[in-house]
Amino acid sequence: MNHFAVILAAGKGTRMKSKLYKVLHPVAGKPMVQHVVDQLTTLGVTRQVVIVGHGAESVKEVLGTSVEYALQSEQLGTGHAVQMAEPVLGQEKGSTLVVCGDTPLLTSETLQSLLQHHAETGAKVTVLTAHADDATGYGRIVRGEDGNVSKIVEHKDANAEELLIKEINTGTYVFDNEMLFEALKQVKNDNVQGEYYLPDVIEIAKADGETIAAYAASTFEETIGVNDRVALAQAETSMRKRTNEHWMRQGVTFIDPASTYIGPDVVIGSDTVLYPGTQLLGNTTIGSECIIGPNSDIRNSEVADQAVVRQSVVTDSKIGPAAQVGPFAHLRQQAVLGANTRIGNFVEVKKSTFGEGSKSAHLSYVGDATIGTNVNLGCGSITVNYDGTNKFQTVIEDDAFIGCNVNLIAPVTVGKNALVAAGSTVTDDVPENGLAIARERQTTKPDYR
């Protein structure tokens, strides 16, 4: 059977008190609505339609062409929002998930179980429910003797007995697609808010004698919608806890899980140790037996097995096996370190490649450079790559030795096994096995004072 999805993302989110569209607020470094789309994609949903409102262009910029869109120009209720998807999905046959774009904690496993329960019961509608310790404000699920849903009662309409029910409506549903759009045509807005409510479809299906099923999520926490900054912080904490526990079960050591932040797309090898203050975000891969942290920030980067990154910032870069980075180093914009390299304190590397065994241990800037194998860059050595208009390349070949406080004025090449004396400013190429000295001879005046 084909599965489709409608993602409700048109709400203004006024309680967030933000210029940023509500569903674009990040949880674990990723917009909330992107979490929802990713889980549905993992599930194999055939088509996803995102209902957008006044922030449509911002949502499209984030999600791109991976989904389809329908515009709800006026917010006239959840039923009206889903109806906006009819031009896209109205003729399809199958099951349609309706999910809110502000539910970043929902997992593909729960949604899969919901779809499976829907199929097994033969229901036309299946509601995702949860058991809440405090159900205040939520619609209550009233089940019949057969275990199916008898009705959903809003909190304000519930009697004393119904208020004791802890099973609540989460706002996530599966509908038979054809029934959904036919029933939406019958939904009225004769209520206090003057809106078209999606749960009214359940009443219509029930009146037609259809089965209304319910499937309970394993935790209430997974189903929460984020409507303000308090809930956003709660979702962040829950996501971090879930992610960290997953990696701990995969053999990764967290010295202090509460202060370690791992993004949802990060991959970590076994026997790696993460120290406090570590952030791993974006499409980052960490190998096995690595040491990361304390206080390291790594984004969209690859770290190979047995590498060490301490108190450093790494962005869009690659670190080779058994390489050592830090403390207080900065790798960015396609920095690539080979095996057994060393980048030490207060060294910045940008758009540069270090061959195996090469090192820059202290106080250096290496930009737009190609460094061979077993090269030593002395303390304070700088690749001078920018003339105010253009960037230029520096090449340092295998086994070269660059002394302290050397300026390499690009474009320039230092040949294999060459030596550049400390304090030199090099403007011309240095040949293989050559020695370059580019500094004033010392003048000493005895008895000057």
Swiss-Prot record:
CDD domains tied to this protein: GT2_GlmU_N_bac, LbH_GlmU_C
Keywords: Acyltransferase, Cell shape, Cell wall biogenesis/degradation, Cytoplasm, Magnesium, Metal-binding, Multifunctional enzyme, Nucleotidyltransferase, Peptidoglycan synthesis, Repeat, Transferase
Residue ranges the record marks as coiled coil: none
Cofactors that this protein relies on: Mg(2+)
Catalytic activity: alpha-D-glucosamine 1-phosphate + acetyl-CoA = N-acetyl-alpha-D-glucosamine 1-phosphate + CoA + H(+); N-acetyl-alpha-D-glucosamine 1-phosphate + UTP + H(+) = UDP-N-acetyl-alpha-D-glucosamine + diphosphate
Free-text comment on the cofactor: Binds 1 Mg(2+) ion per subunit.
Biological process (GO), any one: lipid A biosynthetic process
Pathway in which the depicted protein is active: Nucleotide-sugar biosynthesis; UDP-N-acetyl-alpha-D-glucosamine biosynthesis; N-acetyl-alpha-D-glucosamine 1-phosphate from alpha-D-glucosamine 6-phosphate (route II): step 2/2; Nucleotide-sugar biosynthesis; UDP-N-acetyl-alpha-D-glucosamine biosynthesis; UDP-N-acetyl-alpha-D-glucosamine from N-acetyl-alpha-D-glucosamine 1-phosphate: step 1/1; Bacterial outer membrane biogenesis; LPS lipid A biosynthesis
Active site residues per record: 362
Region listing for Linker, in residue ranges: 230-250
Domain of life: Bacteria
Region ranges (N-acetyltransferase): 251-449
Chief location bin: cytoplasm
Molecular-function GO terms, alphabetical: glucosamine-1-phosphate N-acetyltransferase activity; magnesium ion binding; UDP-N-acetylglucosamine diphosphorylase activity
Residues the entry annotates as binding Mg(2+): 102, 227
Positions that bind UDP-N-acetyl-alpha-D-glucosamine: 8-11, 22, 72, 77-78, 139, 154, 169, 227, 332, 350, 365, 376
Subunit structure: Homotrimer.
Family (UniProt): In the N-terminal section; belongs to the N-acetylglucosamine-1-phosphate uridyltransferase family.
Name listed for the protein in its UniProt record: Bifunctional protein GlmU
Gene, per the UniProt record: glmU
